Amino acid sequence: MIKEIINVVHGTFTQLRSLVMIFGHAFRKRDTLQYPEEPVYLPPRYRGRIVLTRDPDGEERCVACNLCAVACPVGCISLQKAETEDGRWYPEFFRINFSRCIFCGLCEEACPTTAIQLTPDFEMGEFKRQDLVYEKHDLLISGPGKNPDYNYYRVAGMAIAGKPKGAAQNEAEPINVKSLLP
């Protein structure tokens, strides 16, 4: 008889514990979001879609140095270098295959001109895999991105048309080495 009472008390306690657990989970913050209706929280350093930025003058920042393609562990970046009349390099074509990209950010770190930047955009779903291959015109944005005042050619020391050598930002005047001789 005592064993039956213990079984009834144990069964009742188990049922009450289950009810408390259910009510506790009912009022807890939900893990599942109704995605299109509710915006998804993204951390501040989230790495999403890759874009190509422009310098403050409105020109392409990319100098087609090919460092991003070399740094990419899956080889999803391909580009071809071309040169303007004034000696400035630019990519003739720039292609990223987002179906292979793992969004690691190594291309952004390797870029010396900060032309490649990763944005928090993640909605890139397509029905055909070929639509995930983005060309240069798909990747170029109109603004400078994260570094609005940085201009690679002014810092790098390349001669700017109409300006003498040494007139660029962070560039020293040319030194006459013959005047240093005794």
Swiss-Prot record:
Transmembrane segments: none annotated. This is NADH-quinone oxidoreductase subunit I. Belongs to the complex I 23 kDa subunit family. Keywords: 4Fe-4S, Cell inner membrane, Cell membrane, Iron, Iron-sulfur, Membrane, Metal-binding, NAD, Quinone, Repeat, Translocase, Ubiquinone. The keyword Cell membrane applies. [4Fe-4S] cluster 2 binds at C72, C101, C104, C107. It comes from Pseudomonas aeruginosa (strain ATCC 15692 / DSM 22644 / CIP 104116 / JCM 14847 / LMG 12228 / 1C / PRS 101 / PAO1). Its cofactor is [4Fe-4S] cluster. Residues 52-82, 92-121 form the 4Fe-4S ferredoxin-type domain. Its EC number is 7.1.1.-. Signal peptide: none annotated. NDH-1 is composed of 13 different subunits. Subunits NuoA, H, J, K, L, M, N constitute the membrane sector of the complex. NDH-1 shuttles electrons from NADH, via FMN and iron-sulfur (Fe-S) centers, to quinones in the respiratory chain. The immediate electron acceptor for the enzyme in this species is believed to be ubiquinone. Couples the redox reaction to proton translocation (for every two electrons transferred, four hydrogen ions are translocated across the cytoplasmic membrane), and thus conserves the redox energy in a proton gradient. One of its GO terms (molecular function) is quinone binding. [4Fe-4S] cluster 1 binds at C62, C65, C68, C111. One of its GO terms (biological process) is aerobic respiration. GO terms for cellular component: plasma membrane; respiratory chain complex I. Pfam families: Fer4_7 (PF12838). It catalyses: a quinone + NADH + 5 H(+)(in) = a quinol + NAD(+) + 4 H(+)(out). Binds 2 [4Fe-4S] clusters per subunit. It is an enzyme of class 7 (translocase). It is found in: Cell inner membrane. It is a peripheral membrane protein.
